[in-house]
């Protein structure tokens, strides 16, 4: 029951913001006020009853802002979501991005409609993002973070402190939180296999999103990962050495404009520090 109402309030919040245009902060204020009133510090502290109350408050807020109730018909909800994706092609942020990257406006965008898996079905479920190599340094080491009993938005929204993916990351970041390698060793092993397969297939460093639903791993997305200029050089050289790409391909992957990043003083990552 808790999972159902947690998922429902997430849907109302995201649909209300993205499709109906009710600003995100309206929902966050309702949630924050409820947590303060009941002495909760984390979203995971809330019960099924709490989420039921919040879902009703979210719907009431939508009706107050729009003058009409939150749509309950699944077909109306689906077409609203599809229309919102098509409409996003012409928002200001998308226009600026296309201009910066020389992407033609007439290309348009596509919509995928697919069933969803849930990372918030208890402590056998999780969600996370990861890179097949370190996007900051280019080191050939699995890199990423995840959250138990959460959905993908929680990882990027900063609502909860994410946990490291690997024990090496945990030690490097001096984290007190358990790594996925510790708490879900079998799933972590599957993820490592996927990491190798995808990088060998695409022949580039991959940025991946995943969900674990009741101890089953689901891959949601993969794409070529963004990286620093330093990482770009290291990844290109090492992939050529590994035989994944040719030396000619490695040279073509280096953006000449990125050379400027390497000509400035940088902090030594191994220097002693105090925080």
Identify what each model region corresponds to.
Residues 1-274:
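Nucleotide/phosphate-binding sheet-loop regions of phosphoryl- and nucleotidyl-transfer enzymes
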């Amino acid at each position: 029951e808790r999972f159902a109402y947690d998922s429902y309030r997430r849907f109302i919040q995201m649909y209300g913001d993205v499709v109906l245009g009710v600003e995100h902060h309206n929902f966050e204020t309702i949630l924050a006020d409820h947590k303060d009133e009941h002495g909760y510090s984390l979203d995971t502290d809330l019960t099924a009853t709490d989420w039921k109350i919040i879902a009703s408050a979210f719907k009431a807020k939508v009706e107050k802002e729009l003058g009409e109730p939150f749509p309950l018909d699944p077909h109306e909800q689906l077409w609203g979501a599809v229309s919102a994706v098509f409409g996003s092609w012409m928002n200001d942020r998308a226009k600026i991005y296309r201009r910066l990257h020389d992407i033609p406006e007439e290309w348009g965008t596509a919509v995928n409609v697919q069933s969803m898996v849930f990372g918030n079905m208890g402590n056998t479920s999780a969600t996370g993002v990861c890179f097949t190599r370190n996007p900051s340094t280019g080191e050939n080491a699995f890199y990423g973070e995840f959250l138990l009993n959460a959905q993908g938005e929680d990882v990027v929204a900063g609502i909860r402190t994410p946990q490291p993916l690997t024990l090496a990351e945990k030690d490097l970041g001096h984290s007190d939180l358990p790594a996925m390698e510790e708490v879900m060793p079998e799933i972590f092993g599957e993820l490592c296999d996927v990491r190798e397969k995808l990088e060998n297939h695409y022949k580039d460093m991959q940025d991946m999103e995943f969900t674990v639903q009741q101890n089953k791993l689901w891959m949601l997305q993969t794409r070529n990962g963004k990286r620093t200029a330093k990482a770009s050089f290291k990844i290109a050289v090492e992939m050529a050495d590994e035989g994944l790409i040719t030396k000619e391909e490695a040279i073509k992957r280096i953006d000449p404009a990125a050379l400027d990043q390497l000509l400035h003083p940088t902090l030594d990552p191994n220097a002693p520090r105090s925080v």
